[in-house]
């Protein structure tokens, strides 16, 4: 994808603020293997981080700022990891020996966890595909995390703690989704929807 776009693979070769490569989601629970390739990695849950990040980007871009000054400012957002601001040294066996941060860069970097899903940012307008897709319905998240705690499950571990939306919020957002998209079906999304404590009133 980067090659087709004419965007250099390595972060150090991208000098413009227009060519940022940003990563997020479950793969960033171990961000170091792709640290040379991304400019920014969101650690944790990105809905609220992304809003702050985009607002900051717009401000810096409007002022004609350079990439490095923007990245230093972005690193101050909780859960935003900017690999170029850190130096990692390794033991002979390949394990991490030390992580050193540039002046002003936070260490350790704490992942961002949304405390209240009822008040968290939730987009009202979704892109609807113009062709038939496998999951041809709206998707509404009912809770995050999982009460099971299975040791083999990465998602069950990294999305802790368990947080539920109230059934009233789920119902309201589901109605908005149907109105905005034209879908008549909704998927109630979570790691284990049958464990949602408010399933009956919903």
Name each model feature, range by range.
Residues 82-137:
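Ferredoxin-type iron-sulfur electron-transfer modules and their immediate structural context
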Residues 10, 57-60, 81, 86, ...:
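Sequence-level detector for tyrosine residue identity
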């Amino acid at each position: 994808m980067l090659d087709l776009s004419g965007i250099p693979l390595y972060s150090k070769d991208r000098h413009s603020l227009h060519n940022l490569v940003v990563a997020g989601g479950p793969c960033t629970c171990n961000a170091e293997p792709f640290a040379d390739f991304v400019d920014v990695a969101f650690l944790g849950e990105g809905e609220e981080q992304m809003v702050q990040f985009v607002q900051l980007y717009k401000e810096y871009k409007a002022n004609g700022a350079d990439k490095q000054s923007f990245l230093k400012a972005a690193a101050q957002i909780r859960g935003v990891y900017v690999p170029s601001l850190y130096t990692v040294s390794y033991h002979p066996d390949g394990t991490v020996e030390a992580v050193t941060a540039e002046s002003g860069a936070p260490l350790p970097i704490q992942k961002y966890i949304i405390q209240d899903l009822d008040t968290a940012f939730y987009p009202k307008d979704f892109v609807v595909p113009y062709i038939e897709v496998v999951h041809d319905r709206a998707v509404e998240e009912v809770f995050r995390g999982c009460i099971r705690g299975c040791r083999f499950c990465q998602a069950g571990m990294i999305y802790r703690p368990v947080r539920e939306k109230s059934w009233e919020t789920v119902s309201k957002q589901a109605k908005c989704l149907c109105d905005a998209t034209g879908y008549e079906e909704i998927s109630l999304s979570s790691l284990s929807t049958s464990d949602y404590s408010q399933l009956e009133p919903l």
